[in-house]
Regions:
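Positively charged n-region of N-terminal signal peptides that target proteins for export
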Residues: 1-10
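A residue-level marker of the well-folded mature domains of exported/periplasmic proteins
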Residues: 26-431
């Protein structure tokens, strides 16, 4: 098996970002809790608690401490998590911004005061991905402050004079000129209904910040492209202020040609494949690595430069790629499947199975515009009849209320609203 094993301590800091609302393709009628042979004949009953389960995008964990929920990750012998390497991606985003500053420092400093000021849109203060990205940016820019052994990821509110105890001023030297780097403002983008990662809230925030700071804002940074594009369209584009996001959504990648500074691809094409592939393998009764690190009967296989597997936490992680003006044209369509794993499985050897899959928030831009379209392409290739359930981004009950008949499905793919809430789902499967 081609896989790199990481320590549990590293995995605890990781999480993920994916699909959204929609409907599955046609296929067989729900097969209930029966296990079928390759010829389609039913054999033995499978209890819901023993059916394959994959968590994706939100890794079961304590949202305050980041400690992984191992009970959820090991719910049964066919339970896995699929996401991306949050720390590697966070570091990559920070490095991308620093590289941009080094190449454009003089023009970035809009008012010529020697201070490169940035504002930061924080997605969700309790989400591991959001925490990692905030820390990655602050670490790279030198604005991070240590708190209990890690960089403080708390939003600063406003920090016009650099006196905040949450962040500090950083510095960078470019062509013999020294610049101060200051986080002028940051806030969690949560709307009045409680939904986080909210693009509309980010659009309102940049208007407020622009009114307060004016040409002190030299860079806009966001934990994701949904919020980043909202700020870019509302203010940054017109004022020619580089904006950096995360997710490589198609609209953000296209906007690089219009001044969007850059984004990070979390290899959603690999993540979406892994999300359904681990279920396919469990349903086929083959090794979980089949079609992943080991070539399958159709020729599908991934190389270890695009993913790794952490056996201790039963977690698959896709690796990230920086998308900038130099390479953005390669990423313009984020819904194209990954070519090495785009071969159709034989329907006789891999008969159709029924999967219940939810997306935590139907309004999430990344999950809706990138991840779900990829899932819908892979479900055809893997002979899976997937029912897609779209949540409201606020409560688990909006989703779990639609899992009233788990016996109608052969496997489950779950994207929680909050990482703490795995038991809301496993409790249903245990009934």
């Amino acid at each position: 098996m081609k896989k790199r094993i990481l320590a549990l301590s590293l995995s605890a800091a990781m999480a993920l970002s994916l699909a959204a609302c929609g409907g599955g393709d046609g296929g067989t009628q729900p097969s209930g809790s029966q296990e079928t042979t390759s010829g389609g004949a039913s054999t033995t009953e499978v209890a819901n608690k023993d059916k394959p389960l994959v968590w994706f995008n939100r890794q079961p964990s304590n949202s305050s401490t980041g400690e992984l929920d191992m009970a959820a990750l090991t719910f049964n012998d066919n339970t896995y998590y699929v996401g991306f390497d949050a720390n590697q991606g966070a570091e990559l985003q920070g490095t991308m911004i620093v590289d941009y500053i080094k190449a454009h420092a003089a023009e970035i400093d809009r008012n010529g005061d020697g201070v490169i000021g940035y504002v930061l849109a924080v997605g969700d203060i309790g989400h591991n991905d959001s925490i990692a990205r905030t820390r990655g940016v602050r670490a790279a820019l030198g604005t991070g402050v240590d708190k209990d052994g890690s960089i403080d990821s708390t939003p600063v509110g406003t920090n016009a004079d650099g006196s905040s105890a949450i962040v500090q001023d950083g510095s960078i030297e470019v062509d013999g000129t020294s610049y101060t780097i200051r986080e002028l403002a940051s806030q969690e983008m949560k709307n009045s209904a409680g939904a986080t990662w909210d693009a509309a809230t980010a659009g309102n925030a940049i208007a407020t910040w622009a009114s307060s700071f004016g040409d002190q804002i030299d860079i806009v940074v966001s934990n994701n492209d949904g919020m980043g594009m909202s700020m870019f369209n509302a203010w940054s584009k017109e004022n020619k202020v580089p904006t950096f996001g995360y997710d490589a959504n198609s609209d953000a990648v296209a906007a690089i040609a219009e001044g969007y500074g850059g984004t990070i691809s979390q290899h959603a094409d690999v993540q979406a494949y892994l999300t359904l592939r681990v279920l396919r393998n469990a349903l086929d009764g083959v090794d979980v690595d089949m079609g992943i690190g080991t070539e399958d009967d159709a020729g599908n296989v991934l190389t270890d430069d695009v993913f790794y597997y952490d056996e201790a936490t039963r977690s698959y992680y896709a690796l990230n790629v920086a998308v900038t003006a130099e390479n953005y044209e390669q990423f313009l369509d984020s819904t194209v499947t990954y070519e090495p794993v785009s071969k159709q499985l034989d329907a006789t050897a891999h008969p159709t199975k029924n999967v219940w899959l939810n997306i935590y928030n139907s309004a999430d831009n990344f999950l809706g515009s990138t991840y779900q379209p990829l899932l819908q392409k892979y479900d055809d290739l893997l002979n899976l009849n997937v029912e897609y359930i779209a949540g409201d981004g606020q409560t688990e009950s909006n989703i779990t209320n639609r899992l009233g008949n788990p016996s109608a499905y052969d496997a489950f793919a779950i994207n929680m609203v909050k990482t703490d809430n795995a038991a809301s789902y496993t409790g249903i499967l245990n009934q």
